[in-house]
Every structure is written in structure tokens, then in C-alpha cells.
């Protein structure tokens, strides 16, 4: 299928909320090997975020049921098997995205904005793997996630305005990584607060095109800070990450 046709089909699939189809189309576009435009990059990101998002929330629900089920309950094995099925799907999706990132996207990125976008994506998908990993595998996955986020973070600080939505989105997700994966609320709050304060200080540099995106992510940073510094800090913080652009 021609690239233009694949993109048209991906947009149609998005409107129909058929994200698996959308992801298949954008995977095919990526595998053609050319650098993606901003629009194509966003289509790819939205597709896989929805595809993996369904599995992440399903995994959480099933895990919660599993933990509450008595060990003597005959249903426990069925629940465990189902969790492992969802886990397997989630791993497969993450592996596909990480392969696309390493083979095509990061290597082809010619500007800092794209590089940060893809490295952030790499951090995200290793983070999703870390959510379901255990033992040595989990440690390696966490290291991979942190390494990608840190590389993206260093480039973003050097090359992008503090109000840039990609830089803000990276700070949002990196802080969620510190809070949820490394269980380090102090570092999570420091990172989120610094990103928020730096953006506030330079509000006059806000690009009109990205005003809505930037202010939305700033609001999410503030919501997470409120949540993390309150006594009720808990599972729901990742909902903020889910609403990120």
C-alpha cells in the first residue's frame, strides 16, 4: 500500500477508534524507512498509546482481582492465566514499538525535537514493560527506561524551551517513572516542580500553536504534585500521564 493511502487509512481507523488497525498502518509507514513528519509521528504515537493503554488498564484490573482472591479459591488459576495472557500481549506491543524506535525512528531523527520525542517514547515503553516485569528482567528494563528518559531530558534542556510541549511531556512521564517505578516521591516531585516552575517563568515564550498542549501538561504536572504531596498519593497518579499529549 502507498504511504499516502496508509496514512489516510490510519486517520480513518483513529476516527473509528480501531487503534490496532491504526497501529498496523503506521508501523508499515515507519518500516518504509523515511523520517516521519510531525503529523505521522503523532499518528504513530497515538495509535500505540491506545493499543498498549487498553492492555495496561486491563492488567491492573486483573492483578487487583488476583491479589484479592483467596489462595484456596479455584478461580485463582484462571485469573492468573488471564493476567499472563494480557501480559504477553502487552510485552509483544512494547517490543514492537521498541524495535521500530531502535531500527528506524531514533536513527533517522535529524532534529532535536524528534530525537527527544522518540527517546521519551523509548522510556515510556520500557516503563510499561517494567510495570509487569519481575526479578533481574525488571531491573534491566528499569535501567533501559531511565537511560532513555535521561538522554531525552539532557537534550531537551539544551535544545528546547521550558514551555515546549514535548519537553514538558517528557518531564511529566519521567517524574511518573520516578514515583511509580523507582518509588522515589522526592525525586518525582523535584523533577515535576522544576519543570512546572521553569515553564511558568517563561510563559511569554509560549508558541501560539502549542499553547493548549503546553498548558494542559503544566496542569497535569501540578495535579501530580498535589497528589504526590498529599496523604492520599496512590495508584491514580498515572491517569495524569495517560492524558498527556
UniProtKB/Swiss-Prot annotation:
GO molecular function: 14-3-3 protein binding; identical protein binding; protein domain specific binding; transmembrane transporter binding
Biological process per Gene Ontology, one example term: protein localization
Site (Interaction with phosphoserine on interacting protein): 56, 127
Cross-link (Glycyl lysine isopeptide (Lys-Gly) (interchain with G-Cter in SUMO2)): 49
Modified residues (3'-nitrotyrosine): 82, 104
Primary localization: cytoplasm
PANTHER family the record matches: 14-3-3 PROTEIN
Family (UniProt): Belongs to the 14-3-3 family.
Official protein name in the record: 14-3-3 protein theta
